[in-house]
Amino acid sequence: MISVFDIFKIGIGPSSSHTVGPMKAGKQFTDDLIARNLLKDVTRVVVDVYGSLSLTGKGHHTDIAIIMGLAGNLPDTVDIDSIPSFIQDVNTHGRLMLANGQHEVEFPVDQCMNFHADNLSLHENGMRITALAGDKVVYSQTYYSIGGGFIVDEEHFGQQDSAPVEVPYPYSSAADLQKHCQETGLSLSGLMMKNELALHSKEELEQHLANVWEVMRGGIERGISTEGVLPGKLRVPRRAAALRRMLVSQDKTTTDPMAVVDWINMFALAVNEENAAGGRVVTAPTNGACGIIPAVLAYYDKFIREVNANSLARYLLVASAIGSLYKMNASISGAEVGCQGEVGVACSMAAAGLAELLGASPAQVCIAAEIAMEHNLGLTCDPVAGQVQVPCIERNAIAAVKAVNAARMALRRTSEPRVCLDKVIETMYETGKDMNAKYRETSRGGLAMKIVACD
């Protein structure tokens, strides 16, 4: 079973597939060298990056992420503030300390970090890392970053876990989930709670959910407190802090019934601006879509009812259930299915989680998720200058508002829907696979070709 621990992972920006995944791959590679007792023999490491990882890699900091992973770091614990000076040192000296200082190798970046526009055979996000002793290859591994910070090596691509843990209510579709709920009388969050407790202790689960919300709230707080321009040649101004000042100044005087939309926008912009700056965020289910789920929960917290441990668990468990369906039956990778697999999935997850908190039945929760995705079908991934900024940041705000609307529409519906969640997931995947590759995180089409970045 894909767990809430898998869907919501703490990491760093700006991309789960292009930053978090590659960092994990680099760390896994050095762990393998140590396990095989090869580390001491290595004199040089060479990295080859392919497809979407290459085409948008510089803007997504893929090269930096792999280097930091080889150095022994993981996305959830890496010291973000130390990254620039570490990379500068590698660039200056052409040397890299592997595995937390255990062994130093040659690493002239212009020779050892190579970008290739063509795809490897199994996925659009491929990378090959090779360790050499002189001219002799001592170990080489190919990894694929398949979205949401998930990585898999070539040998295990497409394989199920060898020994999956049995859960009380196994599922592979929304229909399965609804059937279990109907037979047991459990809510969808209650059902997912029982499954999670077969994998983790109650204390572990509660701590993880609390940590996730803490990082999400921290992203909002940093985002609404930080001014200036985001890194990169686009020079995109931060907007969340200015929007917060405007909202706070008029909060007690405005009679605008739509002001709540401004707050939702602010929450989402704040998180995504932090992500674009390389800050600490949660894959939800990806970094490119990391502002939607926090924004909708922050909306609930401010305007409906204060979030507590119970409502937090219900929201995140339902959202993760919906996210797992997309992960199992479609994709959450922008390089594979476009932005419908990132922002579209996050919107669907958030709509379902909010519907659960608003008292929806399991069927209504799935309707909310379906509505949210139905109106994200065909969404392209065309990041300008290969950065997770334009159109990504603003798109999260739009999708957060759409998620709230989808949840409300599901709760107010009195007729049977003509489209079910399983069919819209299937449609999303087919649409993504039919989509021209230039609209799937390559920066070779759409807005990416219409906007000239600053020098």
Curated annotation (Swiss-Prot):
Molecular function per GO: 4 iron, 4 sulfur cluster binding; L-serine ammonia-lyase activity; metal ion binding
Species of the source: Escherichia coli (strain K12)
Origin: domain of life: Bacteria
Any Gene Ontology biological process: gluconeogenesis
Catalysed reaction equations from the record: L-serine = pyruvate + NH4(+)
Protein name: L-serine dehydratase 2
UniProt entry keywords in alphabetical sequence: 4Fe-4S, Gluconeogenesis, Iron, Iron-sulfur, Lyase, Metal-binding
Cofactor: how and how many bound: Binds 1 [4Fe-4S] cluster.
